[in-house]
A protein has these predicted regions:
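Sec-dependent signal peptide cleavage junction
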Residues: 18-35
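Structural motif marking the loop-to-transmembrane transition
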Residues: 2-3, 36, 40
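A post-motif C-terminal structural segment
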Residues: 40-42, 51-57, 61-95, 99-103, ...
Length: 453
């Protein structure tokens, strides 16, 4: 359904949302004029890819202390200021993908799905990262996906299609601002997009003064202001599956902040918790909650820096939600988080081991704590039957079903969903992000704030 043919009820809702945004942000601007805000030097913008309200709610319930009468707040809850609309400007689809949503948040422009910082005419649009670099600030991108994936790419590159990740890596190196590389810190996965038969971009970056690091220890030891860190051929392993040598999102965020903060003019940093979305596409509640924890720790690290610095704005949001994740299913008014805590690895990890020949029962009992979830013979048999197909997806789905049934979780899709997503903010001018906003407002506000410094 094309956006221009939206039902009357939805159009009315959008109109009311616009009115709410207008009132809220007019109030914020009035407050800004009457109260002197601290000088803003730095902006840290965090995106939980696919992190709709079902994910933030379920994560709260998962962390809840059952001994208390109320649900404890997460780090996100403390700084909730509003929510944002996510629709694209696409003639064929009115639910966004990550590229269109990230372009809206990076450049303030609605565009078609798959667009990387280009508009509907496929013309390049300036991003907030580029505007920050034009003003002499240090800049960085951090992600648990390939660093060339849709979200980070839409802040630091320009392309007609998110699929062109080699070309996006080329953009990171070749696109200059004031004669300098426009991204000082690049940390994430995607080594295969940089080290290719036609070119080795890691050598090119090193020749220009960047450090190149490939594991956690190298990253922590290196103090260079400019760094390229590629920790996996593609995306990083999920937090629950991650080996010790792979940095967490918090590790990468802290490393980026420490480097960028050396710039006297301040910095802009975009951090993406990429794989809440990937788990949602896979309908994997274990992976989703693992990645929520990884993202929360990175978010907390950014907030802690901002509290000490006092001149840093931290904004966190999502680009869309994924999977149609339902907290509760089958008409049963309960959701149980405890079975998730029994998992020591994701279903993906277990399925991969089984398809390579590992014993089904031993693998399940090795990676699912039997003191927390005692597997039934029927559950083991279902996975064993799936293993006979020698299809990793069938095995993965069978293991995921154990956790869905135990937690009473349901899913409606393997794709994205179109609901509004939460917005969190802390620091100078946080009130500008309050209320009902559009995803393009994120960039518009940041562009305006960059002019203040």
């Amino acid at each position: 359904m094309s956006k221009r043919f939206l039902p009357i009820t939805l159009v009315s809702a959008l109109a009311i949302g616009s009115l709410t945004w207008s009132t809220t942000n007019e109030d914020a601007l009035a407050k800004e004029k009457s109260q002197k805000s601290p000088e803003i030097r730095n902006v840290i913008f965090l995106i939980g890819d696919g992190m709709g309200v079902s994910y933030t709610s379920a994560y709260r319930y998962l962390k809840d202390n059952p001994a208390t009468s109320v649900a404890e707040r997460t780090e996100f809850d403390k700084y909730l200021v509003g929510q944002q609309m996510t629709y694209p400007e696409d003639s064929a689809q009115n639910i966004t993908d990550s590229a269109s949503a990230a372009t809206a948040m990076s450049a303030g422009v609605k565009t078609y799905n798959a667009a990387i910082a280009v508009d509907n005419d496929k013309s390049e649009v300036k991003t907030v990262l580029e505007a920050a670099k034009e003003r002499g600030k240090a800049t960085g991108l951090v992600a648990t996906s390939e660093i060339t994936h849709a979200t980070p790419a839409s802040f630091g590159a320009h392309d007609e299609s998110r699929k062109n990740m080699n070309a996006i890596a080329d953009d990171y190196y070749k696109e200059l601002i004031n004669g300098k590389h426009k991204i000082d810190v690049l940390l994430g996965g995607g080594k295969s997009n940089f080290v290719r038969p036609d070119i080795d971009l890691t050598k090119a970056f090193k020749k220009d003064g960047y450090s190149y690091v490939t594991d956690k220890n190298q990253m922590l030891k290196d103090k260079n202001k400019q760094v390229l860190g590629l920790f996996a051929p593609e995306g990083l392993p999920k937090m629950i599956d991650r080996p010790n040598e792979t940095p967490s999102l918090k590790d990468m965020t802290n490393s980026a902040i420490q480097r960028l903060n050396k710039d006297k003019d301040g910095f802009f940093l975009m951090v993406e918790g990429s794989q809440v979305d990937w788990a949602g596409h896979d309908n994997d509640i274990v992976g989703a909650m693992s990645e929520m924890e990884d993202f929360e720790k990175a978010y907390k690290a950014a907030i802690e820096f901002a509290k000490k610095d006092k001149h840093t704005l931290v904004v966190a949001t999502a680009d869309h939600s994924t999977g149609g994740f339902s907290i509760g299913a089958k008409g049963i008014y309960n959701w149980f988080g405890e079975p998730i805590k029994a998992a020591k690895r994701t279903p993906d990890f277990m399925a991969d081991a089984i398809v390579k020949g590992a014993d089904v029962e031993k693998t399940l009992k090795q990676y699912i704590d039997q003191n927390k979830v005692k597997l039934t013979n029927d559950e083991i048999k279902t996975v064993s039957d799936a293993a006979k197909t020698k299809n990793v997806t069938n095995i993965d789905n069978a293991i995921e079903a154990i956790f869905d049934n135990r937690t009473n979780t349901a899913w409606t899709t393997g794709g994205h969903t179109g609901e509004d997503v939460p917005v969190y903010a802390y620091g100078p001018y946080k009130e500008r992000f309050a209320g009902q906003v559009d995803n393009t407002d994120q960039a518009k506000i940041i562009f305006d704030l960059l002019k203040k410094r």
